[in-house]
Amino acid sequence: MIKSYLLKTGEELREHGDVPAEYRELFSILIENEFKNAVLILNGEALYFESNSVSGLVEVDRKHIGAAKILLRRVAKEAKKVDLSSIEEAFEFAEQLEKADLDGIAKFLR
């Protein structure tokens, strides 16, 4: 589901997975130009970007773009706490979300 992500909190930049150099550059451009949200649909993958107090870019399989938004918000919330277990929890959450039907996803949004 999730191939990689970049997360920027203040001056700290965290990454997970093998983030291509062009995605790092795109991430910087989106932040510099003060984009709030962006979705890029590529051939077999998609990128979801969101910037608030925490900025993030998630690379996912194209069919999981909706889950990327939810996952990024969860990871961003957990990133405010400096705890390595939050990353594991975020991926467990992503697995649960991947298996959920529409009613299950609605529960996560509440």
Curated annotation (Swiss-Prot):
Source species of the chain: Archaeoglobus fulgidus (strain ATCC 49558 / DSM 4304 / JCM 9628 / NBRC 100126 / VC-16)
Protein name in UniProt: Uncharacterized protein AF_1227
Highest taxon of source: Archaea
